[in-house]
């Protein structure tokens, strides 16, 4: 396995479990030093960091709520204090709740947007100076299939994920002269309970949420992480402003 990210430093938000943890581990496998963020669960974040160190990598933990601008600044400082620079930002922190729109109050709406959309704004703003100093930095926002297709009972999540796609394109323009590429990965139909290779038993199209995967199975967190790692590597320096769908073709299904 190549270590194409050797010498790079990454901050991954919401990295204590599931897709975020898989991203942190894969970036570390590529040679990056990784700062593992979680809102408050030190045990989960610490376990991810320890697994990275056990594999010969470098890792640090930075707890903090991305919805808090001061916490966002603190986690960026933790990265630069620990490793001296910041080259990669993965905005993965999210909360996903289902509620019918007619039952959704503003507090529920705001809670999701505060983390999923505003959180990406806060951390990106806090990281901008360090990323510009890198000279060849990367921002990867983790969106979602529903941000492009819509879904019932998730108006707040759909809106936040669609907003992330828009933010990605806007930042690709705004940061074009600074050596920073900005892309989005849109996972869908991911079974975080399974490892590489997806479901052991292929499912029929239309298995979940009324939406099929063309490859006949659910994906894994590791497959999402592989797309993120590619976008952070030297082979993707000509890629910016893009949404990469990691959903087995579900984006094309119906």
Task: Tell what function each PLM region has.
Residues 176, 181, 239-241:
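Short, small/polar-rich loop/turn modules that mediate ligand/substrate recognition or access, typified
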Residues 100-101, 108-113, 209:
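Substrate-binding pocket helix/loop in short-chain dehydrogenase/reductase
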Residues 129, 173-174, 237:
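Alpha-helical segment proximal to the catalytic Tyr-Lys
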């Amino acid at each position: 396995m190549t270590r194409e990210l050797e010498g790079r430093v990454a901050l991954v938000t919401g990295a204590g479990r599931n897709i975020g943890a898989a991203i942190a581990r894969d970036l570390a496998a590529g040679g990056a030093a990784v700062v593992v963020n979680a809102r408050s669960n030190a045990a989960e974040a610490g376990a991810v960091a320890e697994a990275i160190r056990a594999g010969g990598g470098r890792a640090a933990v930075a707890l903090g709520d991305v919805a808090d601008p001061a916490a966002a600044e603190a986690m960026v400082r933790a990265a630069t204090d620990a490793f001296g620079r910041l080259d990669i930002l993965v905005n993965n922190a999210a909360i996903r709740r289902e509620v019918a729109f007619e039952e959704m109050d503003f507090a529920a709406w705001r809670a999701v947007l505060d983390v999923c959309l505003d959180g990406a704004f806060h951390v990106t703003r806090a990281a901008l100076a360090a990323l510009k100093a890198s000279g060849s930095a990367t921002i990867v926002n983790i969106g979602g299939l529903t941000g492009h297709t819509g879904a019932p009972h998730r108006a707040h999540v759909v809106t936040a994920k669609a907003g992330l796609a828009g933010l990605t394109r806007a930042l690709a323009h705004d940061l074009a002269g600074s050596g920073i590429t900005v892309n989005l990965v849109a996972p869908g139909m991911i079974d975080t309970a399974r490892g590489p290779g997806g479901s052991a038993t292929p499912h029929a199209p239309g298995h979940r949420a009324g939406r099929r995967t063309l490859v006949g199975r659910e994906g894994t967190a590791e497959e999402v992480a592989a797309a993120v790692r590619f976008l952070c590597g030297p082979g993707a320096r000509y890629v910016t402003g893009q949404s990469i769908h990691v959903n087995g073709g579900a984006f094309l299904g119906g």
